[in-house]
Amino acid sequence: MVATSKQTTQGYVVEAYGNLLRVHFDGHVRQGEVAYVSVDDTWLKAEIIEVVGDEVKVQVFEETQGISRGALVTFSGHLLEAELGPGLLQGIFDGLQNRLEVLADTSLFLKRGEYVNAICRETVWAYTQKASVGDVLSRGDVLGTVKEGRFDHKIMVPFSCFEEVTITWVISSGDYTVDTVIAKGRTASGAELEFTMVQKWPIKQAFLEGEKVPSHEIMDVGLRVLDTQIPVLKGGTFCTPGPFGAGKTVLQHHLSKYAAVDIVVLCACGERAGEVVEILQEFPHLTDPHTGQSLMHRTCIICNTSSMPVAARESSIYLGITIAEYYRQMGLHVLLLADSTSRWAQALREISGRLEEIPGEEAFPAYLASRIAAFYERGGAVKMKDGSEGSLTICGAVSPAGGNFEEPVTQATLSVVGAFCGLSKARADARRYPSIDPMISWSKYLDSVAEILEKKVPGWGDSVKKASRFLEEGAEIGKRIEVVGEEGISMEDIEIFLKSELYDFCYLQQNAFDAEDCYCPFDRQIELFSLMSHIFSSRFCFDCPDNARSFFLELQSKIKTLNGQKFLSEDYQKGLEVIYKLLESKMVQTA
């Protein structure tokens, strides 16, 4: 098992500076250990971040007003841990994994020093025993299962147990609470262990048992610009940087609603509370398009908003990814949405300043890039010992000041992610939703997706690259038109420009308020993209730029109407037929 000190070490406060305390201690402590500081008849949770001789520096996760020199500090002997077990789904936690709905029963405001269990101890679960007496199991092996919503939640040998365990006793299948002992075992060294449905794991250590494998399954999110131009594989990593008001949070909310994954973990790290309230109001009433159930049944929310303690921002990010890794070990596909990693980086900068460390660029700590890289490296697809596969896809929103993508957090993120979805203020102001700029965005998964789709859609990769070239050429021609007007542009270039605008308006943009167009299934995307490819490869006959513009505006109107029709309905089929007839009326040849 992960070592836990049985003796309680104590100390006292020597100096306080904001939420950073210098504490003298007698005994043994280690970096990352949880400490509790006594103030006003309550105990405030803290974490050791530096050990120097017989003194430690601890960051307190609460308001430190009232702490005086000589205040008693108790060290717990264990690291900052997440409580893992059935009941995490539909849960709303703060950065220290306190259930906010339980805290709300005691007060409208978060009381200082109040901590509750993350998993309800009274809920009864229908437990099915899988292990038998005499089985030799190791960390991550299944002891039994409980039904959590539509998922079979696997109760596993704790991941903190690094020895093989011989099962000596098991409970029969039945209804039990999470604290019920469901099995007993003996390790090779002779230690007797008891297992319940709950286990703990240090949140800053990677949670992995199994073999990391290459991602080979597309994560369909229902946004054409993402699925086609900037695709992401399950187990991949991507980021969504953008300036204030560009739509980062709206994009993350869309991903949480429509991404083709089993579990979604939402980490609201330092963002406004109103955005979390919006999720809590909407999600119970929204239906998962993949299962038909409420979206909350597959969602876990870590809520550490801008009004909550800054020190807990770091723990909220690590808590979210630990919960996501836990569900990945069950062979499930998990999506972690972190909004925003910039707020986490700002918390790192604040504590680094108080530690008087040598600052890096823009006063961020010199180790910022390695911290961000270590976070994204915890994603990926994993093959378990039983042959099943799970994946953890990470999406991090980045909020660069003034939309400057050259700042340290964005640059450190871009060096480690597999896809970059850059949001543009200009596109957002022009009401082009989603405001992802395909000209600056990229994905390393494009060739992998092309290989996966090659059997279903021959030439998919080449067609996407051709569409990207049309966008680039169209943008260049558009700049020339602004300078010299349409009179100085050839008819061929005007046609390329209008085709690129048509592709942008009718394919890359979607209507978030339309029941059909807000989510576009992959089969529908393939058919619409086939239509766009047909338009790209066709040449048309026009007398003048005005006639060309009129034709493409009519075409745009009909395709927009088509996007709002129910897929494969009678109206949809008629609309598609009308569009192809309109194209034939002006077409002179196909390239």
Swiss-Prot record:
Keywords on record: ATP synthesis, ATP-binding, Hydrogen ion transport, Ion transport, Nucleotide-binding, Translocase, Transport
InterPro entries: ATP-synt_VA_C (IPR055190), ATP-synth_a_Xtn (IPR031686), ATPase_a/bsu_AS (IPR020003), ATPase_F1/V1/A1_a/bsu_N (IPR004100), ATPase_F1/V1/A1_a/bsu_nucl-bd (IPR000194), ATPase_F1/V1_b/a_C (IPR024034), P-loop_NTPase (IPR027417), V-ATPase_asu (IPR022878)
Enzyme Commission number, as recorded: 7.1.2.2
Keyword Membrane tagged: no
Coiled coil: none
Binding site for ATP: G242, P243, F244, G245, A246, G247, K248, T249
Molecular function terms from GO: ATP binding; proton-transporting ATP synthase activity, rotational mechanism; proton-transporting ATPase activity, rotational mechanism
Reactions it catalyzes: ATP + H2O + 4 H(+)(in) = ADP + phosphate + 5 H(+)(out)
GO terms (BP aspect): proton motive force-driven plasma membrane ATP synthesis
Entry annotated with the keyword ATP-binding: yes
Family to which this protein belongs: Belongs to the ATPase alpha/beta chains family.
Protein name as annotated: V-type ATP synthase alpha chain
UniProt organism field: Chlamydia muridarum (strain MoPn / Nigg)
